[in-house]
Amino acid sequence: MNISKRITFFLLVCFISLPCIAHRHSGAYAAILENTSDYTDAEKLSRAVEYFQSGKYHEALIWFSKLDKKYKLNPRFQAYMGVCCYYDGEYERAIEALEPILSKLKAFAPHELAVYYYSVADSYFRLNKYIDAVPFYEKHTLLCYNNEKGDSLFRIGICYKHLGDIETAQEYFVEALAYFRRYNDTDRLKYIERELERSTDN
């Protein structure tokens, strides 16, 4: 299971434990409540979660944001918002939402933390801020499942390649290669082997 699917799966498991999830609108009831003003705040939260579960991250973010403006949601819900921003391609906003609260999430399970660190790391990466991405990818490798480590190690290698440190990039590529071989990630294996060849040629 790749990192994106694991992120979604993990957060869905977390959401299941929330009391508000027990309540579900029937189709008829949802049809009646067409206006956001018709929803109670508990229903808005439930609707935000429903959008998230169906992969509608933009819609989920709108609902979470409305509640955050009214109540200033706790760090966990703010973290969910950050993940929504990441999936919605709002990378700067994802960083702004997640990075300041990471220190408040230390009590959470390691893999939940891994999700948040990866979202920050990959947001920096996609913004071409490679030097900022590296420490968050490194933290992710300490928290994530073993079959996810190769992805972050590979991306750290790419970061160092863009930063001009080819020797360090190769070290991370080799380490990532070991994980991809271990978990039989054939697509990544081919890609990283090409990267190693290019690095050697340089």
Predicted regions: what is each one?
Residues 39-66, 70:
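Alpha-helical segment of the N-proximal tetratricopeptide repeat
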Residues 103, 161, 166-184, 190, ...:
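TPR/TPR-like (Sel1-like) alpha-helical repeat modules
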